[in-house]
């Protein structure tokens, strides 16, 4: 619905399907065919998927699409992806502090965030960030531990966080409202 609306107003829109965190992956989890919500590598692959997509668009549609002035919108895990592309980096200290408490936490998004500790390599911001991204809208993002205050405060782009009051996976207070206060960019909005 959002992609159609933006396209109807003249925006070029791309809606990627991330195989490791798609509806098919969730269905496999619910049917007992997978043991994780998503493979840990998806925390790295999703931002890289977007960078790859922008590269392909630049190669094939450079006369029609300005890929040097891109806005990214993502929901839940996609919100994480959008913020990683904007320059938020995985905060290993925050994850090491929070994830041992996973079994007693009521924050279901930590199930995904704490998967980062299973990634076998250390990833730096430059690998996930994309300078072509100029603004971000993150809807119900999961950010509290994987980015934390230190990382979110480094984003310099305009950011809009959209929060819902009834999201059982990414609860509003710890995942959007408090993290909104960590943003230091001049252009920040909480909806």
Report residues per predicted region:
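Alpha/beta-hydrolase active-site loop
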Residues: 28-29, 35-68, 84, 93-114, ...
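Catalytic histidine neighborhood in serine/cysteine hydrolases
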Residues: 183-191
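Short beta-strand immediately N-terminal to the catalytic nucleophile in serine-hydrolase-like folds
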Residues: 72-74, 162
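Conserved alpha/beta-hydrolase "acid-adjacent" motif
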Residues: 147, 168-175
